[in-house]
Amino acid sequence: MKTLVTYFEPFGGRNTNASKEVVSLLSDYDIKELPVSWNKIESIIDEILSNDLDYLFLIGESGKYEEITVERTAHNICNGKDNYGVAKDNEPISGGPEELKTKFNLDNLPYCISDDAGKYLCNYTYYLALSKAKNTKVVFVHLPYINDNLDHLKNDLLSIIKSLTRKDN
């Protein structure tokens, strides 16, 4: 069972990113850093999905959440300025439907489930991965900012990954 867990570099002038801090602790999984770049992310997603993965877990950080949140839906919209100065102003992602949903069944997860991955690069990356994944199950998980909750977030993320990759899901 080939699984990749990704995280984002810090963005928005912050020195760290909760996704990087937590995912770097997952020693049993292949991990990869993603840039916060509108122009670079599509080719990276293409490269990732060319590796015949069974599962792709995209992990990001959001200050709007106080707890770990699993995103069910990605929307066809981009907004905000990336780390390289490229800005999007509520622009649609070309050639796709209004929204895409994960193929994972999230109904029995004991975590917050959201249908709004935002408009920034988390959503864009998720939308691209869902639209391009043929035989790979993809899901996005947002982490809150880290305070004294690093171990708790790591354990919750591991629980989500293990729950979703069980054969019966």
Please provide the spans of the model-predicted regions.
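N-terminal catalytic or cofactor-binding beta/alpha core of small enzyme domains
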Residues: 1-119, 130-135, 145, 149-168
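Active-site-adjacent betaalpha module
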Residues: 125-126
